[in-house]
């Protein structure tokens, strides 16, 4: 980012500046962060980053707020069900800091559309998407463009937020998603990747959601993403993915301040 927004943010972020200092706050104010996936993890990443003074966001997600998001996603309320997550998050960000610039992309990131995103303009990338295909493509693009990236590993089917850790992907253990990511990244020659993962053994869901979900809260006929058609819907609680999101945001802030 090129503009200097630090002075305008002084009063709102004065307590943060007491810890980070003015130079760091200026860096944050002039940083552009792309958050891929505005869900249980990504929503809290955005929340903490805007409250920390980040000056520009790119929000990428094709989903709309669903009734089943109410148990854990910071953007989910009865009033926002049915609306695009990116649009709701943008409104929330601007309510917190109207001086922030927010760019929204109502689409799902895939290798096929990777070139549509201005990676060279990002100062940091947060991977909070669910699918391995998208995560791998995102990491590869970030490495190609030499943009710092941090990836969220599995936060579903877990109950203990205290077991999240920050590590290189090749030093992770227990997490099934991290295991797959290690294998796929090794094939592609990726030597390192900062991730947030949990060492908690995943809890087996008490019910088969793929069979029992019949709410059809906003899933219209023919929709690409329908709860009733997903093979495996993980269990979730409010106090786990939120922790992962806040840890990720902390890493982003610290890295941007050191840059």
Go through the PLM ranges and name each one.
Residues 1-34:
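N-terminal charged helix/coil linker that caps or initiates catalytic domains
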Residues 2-6, 120-121, 134, 144, ...:
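Glycine-rich phosphate/adenylate-binding loop
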Residues 106-114:
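Conserved SAM/SAH-binding loop
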């Amino acid at each position: 980012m090129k503009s200097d927004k630090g002075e305008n943010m002084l009063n709102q972020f004065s307590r943060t500046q007491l810890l980070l200092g003015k130079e760091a706050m200026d860096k944050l104010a002039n940083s552009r962060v792309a958050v891929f996936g505005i869900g249980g993890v990504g929503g809290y990443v955005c929340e903490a980053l805007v409250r920390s003074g980040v000056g520009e966001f790119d929000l990428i997600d094709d989903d709309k707020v669903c009734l089943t998001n109410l148990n854990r996603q910071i953007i989910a309320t009865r009033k926002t069900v049915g609306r695009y997550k990116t649009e709701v998050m943008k409104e929330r960000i601007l309510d917190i800091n109207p001086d922030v610039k927010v760019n929204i992309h109502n689409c799902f990131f895939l290798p096929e559309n990777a070139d549509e995103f201005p990676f060279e303009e990002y100062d940091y990338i947060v991977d909070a998407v669910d699918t391995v295909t998208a995560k791998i493509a995102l990491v590869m693009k970030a490495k190609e463009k030499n943009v710092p990236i941090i990836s969220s590993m599995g936060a579903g089917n877990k109950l203990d937020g205290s077991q999240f850790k920050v590590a290189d992907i090749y030093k992770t253990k227990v997490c099934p998603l991290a295991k797959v990511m290690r294998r796929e990244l090794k094939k592609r020659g990726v030597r390192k990747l900062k991730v947030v993962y949990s060492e908690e053994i995943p809890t087996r869901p008490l019910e088969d959601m793929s069979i029992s979900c019949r709410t059809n809260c906003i899933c219209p006929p023919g929709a690409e993403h329908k709860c009733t058609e997903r093979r495996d819907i993980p269990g979730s609680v409010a106090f786990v993915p939120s922790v992962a999101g806040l840890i990720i945001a902390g890493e982003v802030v610290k890295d941007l301040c050191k840059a």
